[in-house]
Amino acid sequence: MENKFPGKDISEKDLASKIPLSSSKNKKKIVKISKDTSFGGDLIPIIAGRNTVENESILFKCCESMEKNNLKLLRAGIYKPLTFPYRSKNYFELGDKGWRIIEKVKKNFDVMIVSEIMEESKISIMNNYVDIYQIGARNMQNYPLIVKVAKTKKPILLKRHFGASIRDLLGSAEYALLQKNEKIILCERGVAAPHTHKATSRFLLDLQAVPALHEYSCLPVVVDPSHACFWHKWVHNLTLASLAVGANGLMIEMHPDPRNAAVDPLQAINLDEFTKLVNQLRIISETLNKTIV
């Protein structure tokens, strides 16, 4: 263990030979999304919205909330990887038709789109609308997909799989960086552990992963507390904690009527709760010499 970092599975040899591009031995990267939005510096972007776009009305209301809070990064999932193949009677996947809604959103609001890609064949259509590609937890080690998306040269939000180590996550990031795409953002979204309080929480939010990734890697780190805890009433405190431990960005699920959401009704916060949370984040960020955007 003398060649290992304390308590983790990354060695000095790993930094040099297995993850040389994502290693902390390199200069810390700032991933610029637009003139006023970037990850890894003094700005803390908030990615908020829906992991699944249900209809135009709901997404427009989310955009109005974003506008009210002076935020730019809208989460808008068109393709949804559900754990089971069965859908509720309230939900149907819009599929490629969903991009028509995104087109209207971009015409009516000053937002940038963050959306998950699940298969290579969707790159051609998504490239027309997406500002940040999300590689979801289930595809974290889908290396052919990561390579193809990296070749678009667009920013990638790479989510850590709930059973993956930090070493695994950085290995996946290395595939993208090897394509000369340096716009890689890591995302902690909770890990599965047999001893966690399964009755009250879906996953365990690994807050320790944030300072650990900062120590081992040069890449910015976003935290998604919504998908980790799965309970809306805990999202607020876990988001504040994520900022406190050094998150370079935050991902928050919101909905105008969460309890009637077609997908994941338990984890989204309503628009008033979202505004309250953003206001508190701004106060805390000032003490850290950071700015919420």
Labelled PLM ranges:
Residues 39, 63-70, 103-108, 127-128, ...:
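Acidic (Asp/Glu)-rich catalytic clusters
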Residues 89-115, 148-155, 207-221, 267-290:
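Alpha-helix-loop-beta-strand connector modules within alpha/beta enzyme cores
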Residues 28-51, 82-86, 214-223:
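N-terminal small/glycine-rich loop or linker at the start of catalytic domains
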Residues 39, 152-257:
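Catalytic alpha/beta core domains of metabolic enzymes, predominantly
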Residues 5-47, 288-293:
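N-terminal amphipathic alpha-helix/helix-capping segment at the start of soluble metabolic enzymes
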Residues 75, 92-94, 110-122, 131-146, ...:
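Catalytic beta/alpha-barrel core
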Residues 75-97, 255-266:
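Glycine-rich, proline-tolerant flexible connector loops at the mouths of alpha/beta enzymes
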Residues 44-61, 84-92, 112-116, 136-137, ...:
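Active-site mouth loops of central-metabolism enzymes
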